Amino acid sequence: NIVWAESKTAEPPASLPVTGGKFVEGISPFGITNFRGSNMQFGIKRVDRGRHMYIIGQTGTGKSGLLTLLTLSDIFHNQGFAVVDPHGDYATDIMQFIPESRINDVTYFNPADMENPIGFNPMEVYDQNMKGHTSSELVGVLKRMFESWGPRLEYILRYTILALLDTPDTTMLDITLMLTDVKFRKKIVDNVTDIVVKQFWTIEFASWNEKFATEAVAPILNKVGAFVANPMVRNIIGQPKSTFNVRKIMDEGKILIVNLSKGLMGEDNAAIMGALMVTKIQLSAMSRADIPRVEDRTPFYLYVDEFQNFATDSFAVILSEARKYGLNLTVANQYISQMPPEVKDAVFGNV
């Protein structure tokens, strides 16, 4: 009997970054060659990690294993990173490998832990120049997550968020309050500094009769209300002060692990919370524009599994611009067809 080979095994390239099974500075190991019975551990040079990575494969093909190996390399190279995991297994696996020397670097975000809810306020703004970006991104997240959407809904929601951002300690819970409580709305509008935003509330919105106003805000109340009605979500985004500062985590090379287990949170809530977190990381990276020299922006690695669940319209912007802010993405999913066309173009143009 003759066994026919369908392909020829080639010798690994001479320039392949090999580690010899040991920790090697400057290399992130993730595989083994077995040419002619000789096993050699190899990886990717850390300098090449400055480019984004896209990992694709169906369930059981090793995506999570590869993500874990790359993350472990960041841990042992004392680099900062964030993990956004919609399943929970990847996040819990990483927690097991955190060495004692880096335990104090870790922020573990687990919404399912209702006894110890960690605060995360997507509307918390440290730089007043970022208010416009924050408003646009929050609208983008909600738009991505809801099937029915209209221009009037987006118009009112945008001015609602812009008004709330001028008052410290407001949260997403205040969106519905702004649209239903006259006294609260007046207090917020009194704090508004942008003349266009103020005119919307004092002239345009104030001119609407009760019936028209009720019909106009109803879709927002339905959509935002459904999200904040979940006590698990409300315990987190209802806190005016975030327990952690994403920009500080990035600049100091710390670790942020986000466990968004869909089995515990529900698929819709996990998707919105994940999109809000990815958006917060994006905005924090963009705020690094206040560091003049690109080389002074500490490298930070963001890992997003099943990233199509969290990809808003601006995700393409993250992929195309994040590197200059020191944010390096590694994203994974199962099928190319899961990505919206604009995100697909950005992925293949920047990885």
Language-model regions: role of each:
Residues 1-30, 231:
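An aromatic-glycine-centered, glycine-rich loop/turn in mixed alpha/beta architecture
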Residues 30-38, 46-48, 58-59, 66-327, ...:
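P-loop NTPase motor domains
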Residues 52:
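Walker A (P-loop) ATP-phosphate-binding motif of ABC ATPase nucleotide-binding domains
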Residues 86, 332-338:
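Conserved H-loop
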